């Protein structure tokens, strides 16, 4: 079975999200999406399995010293307080916590900021986000560089 999905969506609970879960799923359905991953910043919000006929994937976007790492398909919330006990966590610590919670770790929009040095990360994600509209608006070649990074990692 094939699904059309957006695996990086923020609700109004994130500083850069504007919509409620109800509004997001209605818009996703109208756009022809079958599923969306709710990945609010540093917040693991429980979500119903479906809303407005759209499959909801539980997730969280974690701010780390190496950029953002998104956890998808989390079976339980991340221990964000434990991760941040000494400030921003290392990316590898976030990946380990995501894996402990049954999730998939995604390096999110690695080149969104000019001069980002994502090649310097000390961990191996399960995936690299290769298409992000906001990243492309900020840095023209961000998505192309992210796709090349994924390919170089064999992902």
Predicted regions, residues:
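Short, well-ordered beta-to-alpha junction loops that form the rim of enzyme active sites
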Residues: 109-111
């Amino acid at each position: 079975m094939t699904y059309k999905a957006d695996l990086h969506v923020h609700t109004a609970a994130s500083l850069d999200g504007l919509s409620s879960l109800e509004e997001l799923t209605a818009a996703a359905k109208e756009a022809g999406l079958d599923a969306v991953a709710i990945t609010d910043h540093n917040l693991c919000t429980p979500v119903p399995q479906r809303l407005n006929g759209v499959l909801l994937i539980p997730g969280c976007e974690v701010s780390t010293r190496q950029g953002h790492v998104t956890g998808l398909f989390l079976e339980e919330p991340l221990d964000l307080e434990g991760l941040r006990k000494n400030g921003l966590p290392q990316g590898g610590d976030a990946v380990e916590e995501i894996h402990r919670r049954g999730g998939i770790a995604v390096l999110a929009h690695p080149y969104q900021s000019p001069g980002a040095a994502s090649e310097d990360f000390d961990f191996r994600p399960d995936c690299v986000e290769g298409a992000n509209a906001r990243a492309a608006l900020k840095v023209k070649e961000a998505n192309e560089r992210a796709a090349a990074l994924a390919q170089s990692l064999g992902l």
